[in-house]
A protein has these predicted regions:
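Membrane-interface interhelical linkers
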Residues: 1-30, 52, 62-89, 134-143, ...
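C-terminal-most transmembrane helix of multi-pass membrane proteins
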Residues: 2-17, 57-60, 68, 157, ...
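Juxtamembrane helix-loop-helix junctions in multi-pass membrane proteins
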Residues: 33-64, 109-112, 181-209, 223, ...
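Specific transmembrane alpha-helical segments of multi-pass solute transporters/efflux pumps
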Residues: 34, 38-41, 67-117, 153-154, ...
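Hydrophobic/aromatic residues within transmembrane alpha-helices
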Residues: 45, 54, 58, 104, ...
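Specific alpha-helical transmembrane segments that line the substrate/conduction pathway
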Residues: 53-64, 93-94, 102-140, 178, ...
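Helix-helix packing/entry segments at the starts of transmembrane helices
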Residues: 55-57, 113-119, 188-211, 241-281
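Hydrophobic transmembrane alpha-helices of multi-pass small-molecule transport proteins
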Residues: 66, 88, 94, 119, ...
């Protein structure tokens, strides 16, 4: 969701924003909880719908929901605004993200996969330092990057020991690659004309462009598509489509239009925490001391990277 977060955050904030209150905290925690559960639901849905076909179908359904939302709110999705080619690029990168995260979750636990997926904010901070004027690495961001790197190394040490297999290590690395492409999508949004269009159109580009690419990839890798559609598989798929892509996104945009964006974005560190808890409670995935410590380091890193700068008062 980091690319949607950034797309919405980049819009000019309205004046008269409210300070963070209980309603904001409930909405923010709800959004982060839904994103944390997303990878768990994707892994469950993988049991009945193969990963790339699932991603393609989800993006088609989500695109229809976003189109209906934009029509209802009077948001132009097809106006000529110079965003076509950057939109194509963001859609391609979005597809690459799913081409790694889906198969990665087949090979590794959801609680570990989300840890590597959430390296995206750190790749963004690093890339922005070199690509985006005025978005340099501060001391706090560097500390955050180092904390996250230490967390990843600690997590990988599990795989390099007796508890890992070549397949599970490959799954971890696939999820790390997904985090890289997630970050690349965000950087394209920040560095091009996509920065100035509505977040709804940004998301629409990603969904519409990626869907046929993912379907072609599913055919190329000879995926079966729909294996079986039990109630758990169907509800998991609908959760990732309706709740995560559509409802949580709409709530997030409302929060960014109502409260200061810098304070809202700090809450994203909760995402991987909820994911590890959900993986343990719902899927019975083990939480080793290394994974727990790695989670805390990555969450701390996300907090430091997104923490608003303190302003000197005169």
């Amino acid at each position: 969701m980091q690319d949607k977060i950034d797309a919405a955050t980049n819009r000019t904030a309205p004046s008269g924003l409210r300070p963070i209150d209980l309603l904001a905290v409930v909405g923010l925690v709800g959004c982060c909880m839904s994103w944390g559960l997303n990878q768990v639901a994707m892994k469950v849905a993988n049991d009945g719908i193969t990963p790339l076909f699932q991603a393609s179908a989800r993006n088609v359904m989500a695109a229809l929901l976003i189109w209906g939302w934009a029509w209802w709110r009077g948001i132009a999705l097809f106006a000529s605004d110079g965003s076509f080619w950057p939109g194509m690029a963001s859609g391609l990168l979005f597809a690459l993200n799913f081409m790694f995260i889906g198969p990665g979750l087949v090979l590794t636990e959801a609680s570990r996969g989300v840890l590597f997926l959430y390296t995206a904010p750190f790749f963004v901070a690093l890339g922005a330092h070199f690509l985006l004027p005025g978005d340099r690495l501060s001391l706090l961001k560097v500390i955050g990057l180092l904390a996250a790197f230490a967390g990843l190394m600690l997590s990988l040490s599990d795989r390099l020991g007796a508890g890992g297999t070549p397949a599970s290590l490959r799954g971890d690395l696939y999820c790390l690659a997904a985090g890289f492409f997630w970050a690349a999508t965000t950087l394209v949004i920040r560095a091009t004309t996509l920065r100035w269009i509505s977040p709804e159109k940004n998301l629409f580009y990603e969904l519409v462009v990626s869907a046929p690419i993912l379907l072609a990839a599913a055919w190329f890798y000879d995926e079966q598509g729909i294996v079986h559609l039990g109630p758990v598989v169907v509800w998991s798929f609908l959760y990732t489509t309706v709740v995560v892509v559509f409802i949580s996104y709409a709530v997030w945009v409302w929060l960014l239009n109502t409260y200061p964006a810098s304070q809202v974005s700090v809450f994203t560190f909760l995402g991987p925490i909820f994911a590890v808890i959900a993986g343990h409670l719902l899927l019975g995935e083990p939480v080793t001391w290394r994974l727990g410590a790695a989670l805390l380091l990555v969450a701390l890193g996300i907090y430091l990277v997104n923490r608003p700068r303190s302003r000197v008062r005169h």
